Amino acid sequence: TSSYKASVKGYGEVMPIDALTLVAQVSGRITQLSDTFQTGAVVKKGEVLAFIDDTDYVEALSSAKTDYESAVVALEEERLQGVQALDEWQRSGLEGEPASALVLRQPQLKAAQASLDEAKQVLETAKRDLAFTEITAPFDALVVTRDVSLGSYV
């Protein structure tokens, strides 16, 4: 047996598996760009490419934390007022159930719980928005073009 060495030449077009136009998920002014975030550079998954001014987002998070803590206190106060109302109703000597749920503060307790749930949602949104002020590479990639500069508003 003998061996034969074949050589093949061809032309083609290379296409990426994934292509992405990266956009910010929150708005603001670009305060810092990574040195590696340049046209033609290869970036790694999770690498921070740019920072958006986070001042407003830090303030929003602080406010959301305060509102959440206030809602926790308000719910506990309302729960205790309901316990006190039930105790007063039982000590009054009246028979049966109160004519209205308002007497035992049940609607007020539900409203306080709803306020807490809303405050929790606002807090989670504020945390997420603050995290989005760091623009990161979603996967290992080649930067084809960089259409943002320091100071740009996105």
Could you describe each region identified by the protein language model?
Residues 1-3, 13-15, 27, 31-32, ...:
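Periplasmic scaffold and linker elements that assemble and bridge Gram-negative envelope complexes
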Residues 24:
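Conserved phosphate/oxyanion-binding catalytic-loop motifs
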